[in-house]
């Protein structure tokens, strides 16, 4: 379930996505992948645990139990992988993001957004990734959490899997391919 516009136009608010959780099928997480991950360091507010015990709540709990809906207590996010271990990511020279000194073409960025309004110069640590939303003006991603314990990076151990498609609403169903960040 996509609750915000942080990944527009790749993903829309209220889209339901299919996630490949099998590492031997999905392979290594790489630049350009759209991934689901558990909140690495309090990026999100605490989940509301005061739900009333209604039939709707019980149905939702059942769908969470069988894996159709995400567990709200686990606080999942969806972002695009921009950098992997060892990458030096710098923003922004001439309104371009660079990875390892190479300017990046980002066709997926929401129209009218710059790569970032926040400047940064980060080298991704081993076992971590740097993530950003496609709608940069509406995404509190790695850039906004550089002062947390992970320096805004997401440990690979927190990654649930790679998004491979939108499955609902049905008229919006589509594949979500990885888009190479570096050519």
Please give the residue ranges for each predicted region.
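Aromatic-capped interface at the extracytoplasmic side
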Residues: 1-7
